[in-house]
């Protein structure tokens, strides 16, 4: 049988890239080869392990979208888009592509359109309940759209299937919360995650909030800041006299181990983040990102809070005083209960479900 090859398209943020890696690994376990289509400067160049380690070779194109970067950028956008179309078509042919998976990011529009024109099955993963912008554009040519959550968009999309969001296998297979929480003593363990790009409001608020707590009340904190913010956050903790019990990292490579170790996570409420919290079974304080055009993160946070799986703390209410009071009142029995409720909301085997859809389309097309 001819070797089957999947091209994964994902760029820009960990929320696109990390679930793509989960599906890529699942397809490799099924005997497929996998390559990655990203952008020249994107985070995918760091997050996707080298081919010698992962077996995933990287192809990149020079494309960063059409909007919001000045008049000249917009005026030359058509030429750059044509160049991106040509580059994607060349890559898909050279890779002898069997199917194409779009996870999100600028690369998905030219890559997805070329996949359709070349007759390759095109599967899109839509992390939120509402359709993402690139997926709206590609909806007419997509063979399948795998939704992370139920919602009106999935119900009204002909090609829709609700799979849940793909989660790293090492997170999905963590022990149940009661096993992890058993025997824990001492200060609470707080994991602060601003996402792969960092979250400014969390970086600014956490040091001030901890400074309001007496030393005996302070949790131990691991704070992930984003690549550009590490030094500034370390200085902020030092400025308020907190030198002990806090570890500051730009990025967390072994997220599963960190989730397993912590009692509670303070983070944004992106769809992939929420899916990982549920898969792991971890309590959380969710501070949704404020975006004028969507309410996705707020909806995610409310959903978790309504099920007792998280505390929803709107950014408009996030002050050092409010966060300090939240931390002061948390205890492990309460957090264990939240963790168990989060685990109950998980959708196991999402990566395998997406892989099933890919193989189903390939069989249908006789490839």
Curated annotation (Swiss-Prot):
Its EC number is 2.4.1.227. One of its GO terms (cellular component) is plasma membrane. Pfam families: Glyco_tran_28_C, Glyco_transf_28. Coiled coil: none annotated. One of its GO terms (biological process) is peptidoglycan biosynthetic process. UDP-N-acetyl-alpha-D-glucosamine binds at residues 13-15, 168, 196, 252, 297. Pathway: Cell wall biogenesis; peptidoglycan biosynthesis. Keywords: Cell cycle, Cell division, Cell inner membrane, Cell membrane, Cell shape, Cell wall biogenesis/degradation, Glycosyltransferase, Membrane, Peptidoglycan synthesis, Transferase. GO terms for molecular function: UDP-N-acetyl-D-glucosamine:N-acetylmuramoyl-L-alanyl-D-glutamyl-meso-2,6-diaminopimelyl-D-alanyl-D-alanine-diphosphoundecaprenol 4-beta-N-acetylglucosaminlytransferase activity; undecaprenyldiphospho-muramoylpentapeptide beta-N-acetylglucosaminyltransferase activity. Transmembrane segments: none annotated. It is a peripheral membrane protein. It comes from the Bacteria. It is found in: Cell inner membrane. HAMAP family: MurG. This is UDP-N-acetylglucosamine--N-acetylmuramyl-(pentapeptide) pyrophosphoryl-undecaprenol N-acetylglucosamine transferase. The lineage of its organism: Bacteria, Pseudomonadati, Pseudomonadota, Betaproteobacteria, Burkholderiales.
């Amino acid at each position: 049988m001819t070797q089957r090859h999947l091209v994964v398209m994902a760029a820009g943020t960990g929320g696109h890239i990390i679930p793509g890696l989960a599906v890529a690994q699942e397809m490799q376990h099924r005997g497929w080869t996998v390559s990655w289509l990203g952008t020249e400067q994107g985070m995918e160049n760091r997050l996707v392990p080298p081919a010698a380690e992962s077996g995933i070779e990287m192809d990149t194109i020079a494309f960063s979208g059409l909007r919001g970067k000045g008049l000249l950028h917009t005026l030359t956008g058509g030429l750059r888009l044509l160049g991106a179309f040509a580059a994607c078509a060349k890559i898909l042919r050279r890779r002898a592509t069997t199917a194409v998976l779009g996870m999100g990011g600028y690369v998905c529009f030219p890559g997805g359109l070329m996949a359709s024109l070349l007759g390759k099955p095109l599967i899109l993963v839509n992390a939120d309940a509402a359709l993402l912008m690139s997926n709206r554009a590609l909806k007419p040519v997509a063979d399948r759209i795998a939704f992370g959550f139920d919602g009106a968009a999935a119900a009204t999309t002909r090609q829709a299937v609700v799979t849940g969001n793909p989660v790293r296998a090492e997170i999905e297979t963590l022990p149940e919360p009661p096993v992890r929480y058993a025997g824990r003593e001492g200060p609470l363990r707080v994991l602060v995650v601003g996402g792969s790009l960092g979250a400014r409001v969390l970086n600014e608020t956490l040091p001030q909030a901890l400074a309001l707590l007496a030393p005996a009340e302070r949790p131990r904190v691991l704070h992930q800041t984003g690549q550009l913010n590490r030094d500034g956050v370390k200085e902020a903790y030092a400025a308020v006299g907190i030198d002990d019990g806090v570890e500051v990292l730009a990025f967390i490579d072994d997220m599963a181990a960190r989730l397993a170790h912590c009692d509670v996570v303070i983070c944004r409420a992106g769809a992939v983040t929420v899916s990982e919290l549920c898969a792991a079974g971890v309590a959380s304080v969710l501070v949704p990102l404020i975006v004028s055009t969507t309410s996705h993160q707020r909806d995610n946070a409310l959903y978790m809070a309504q099920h007792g799986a998280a505390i929803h703390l709107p950014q408009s209410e996030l002050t050092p005083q409010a966060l300090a009071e939240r931390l002061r009142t948390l205890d492990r029995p309460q957090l264990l209960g939240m963790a168990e409720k989060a685990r109950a909301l998980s959708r196991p085997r999402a990566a395998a479900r997406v892989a099933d859809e890919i193989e189903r389309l390939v069989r249908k097309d006789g490839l």
